[in-house]
């Protein structure tokens, strides 16, 4: 019985460490954000998707929590992968990417994470304050799904409204 508890404890510890490792380096302070966002826009255009920029940093617990919430939920993961090319835009002491954030209307004023949606041509069409997606000490999965769906290419396609 003691061995079972030790094994279970080790499993929980290693699983928690592997999840924290998955989010430890979401944001790259050394990245050329302008260049990488341009590549994301190019990819989005080719795949008929939008770009979802997640502004934040590796220091941001809420940023990591959001990424884990989406990655660990099959429905959310499916929606985001079907409709968006995701880019993590760094904001940290090492690199605040001030010019890039300025280009998108200073969304850091909302705190982090902050979400910027670009259409397939790279135009900013929406900025989302993450506080509207939060619930308690986590995120509301239904609100995240609504956000992704409301700002998807299909939601903004005029063909879907010409009846």
Q: For each predicted feature, which ranges?
A:
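Bacterial Sec-dependent N-terminal signal peptides
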Residues: 1-21
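A short beta-strand-turn-helix
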Residues: 32-50
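Loop/turn elements at helix/coil->beta-strand transitions in domains of secreted/extracellular proteins
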Residues: 47-51, 82-87, 112-113, 120
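Non-catalytic, surface beta->alpha helical segment in thiol-disulfide oxidoreductase systems
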Residues: 109-161
């Amino acid at each position: 019985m003691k061995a079972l508890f030790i094994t279970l404890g080790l499993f929980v510890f290693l699983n928690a460490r592997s999840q924290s490792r998955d989010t430890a380096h979401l944001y790259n302070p050394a990245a050329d954000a302008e260049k990488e966002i341009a590549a994301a826009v190019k990819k989005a255009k080719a795949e008929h998707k939008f770009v979802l920029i997640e502004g934040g940093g590796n220091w941001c617990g809420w940023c990591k929590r959001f990424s884990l919430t989406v990655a660990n939920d099959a429905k959310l993961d499916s929606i985001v992968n079907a409709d968006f090319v995701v880019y993590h835009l760094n904001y940290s002491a090492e690199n605040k990417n001030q010019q890039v954030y300025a280009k998108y209307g200073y969304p850091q004023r909302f705190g982090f994470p902050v979400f910027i949606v670009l259409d397939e041509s790279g135009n900013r069409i929406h900025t989302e304050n993450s506080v509207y997606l939060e619930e308690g000490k986590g995120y509301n999965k239904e609100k995240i799904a609504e956000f992704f769906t409301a700002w998807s290419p299909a939601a903004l396609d005029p063909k879907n409204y010409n009846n």
